[in-house]
Amino acid sequence: AFAGILSDADIAAGLQSCQAADSFSCKTFFAKSGLHSKSKDQLTKVFGVIDRDKSGYIEEDELKKFLQNFDGKARDLTDKETAEFLKEGDTDGDGKIGVEEFVVLVTKG
């Protein structure tokens, strides 16, 4: 799904950083996987993969499954991790992350 954007090694490095429950940090994942240095167009494509229901937003249930977009065998995020991820990315307080919010979240480092 991320061909031409992330290599398998980049994805593995990102997943390696958050194997234990409650160890996920979106900033760490974005940095380790190299997502933080991608273009807005590339990040918009990544957003489209994570937005599984194609609503134009990443909702809480999609955040919980975030890691599985990168590896189908990856774990669900815990409720705590999901809530922190949402809080980091949802700058307008509507309870979901839009594409602009996602691009800012990934690139702000």
From Swiss-Prot:
Pfam family, one: EF-hand_7
InterPro entries per record: EF-hand-dom_pair, EF_Hand_1_Ca_BS, EF_hand_dom, Parvalbumin
Residues annotated as binding Ca(2+) 2: 90, 92, 94, 96, 101
Domain of life: Eukaryota
Keyword Repeat belongs to the record: yes
Family label: Belongs to the parvalbumin family.
Stated name of the protein: Parvalbumin beta
Gene source species: Boa constrictor
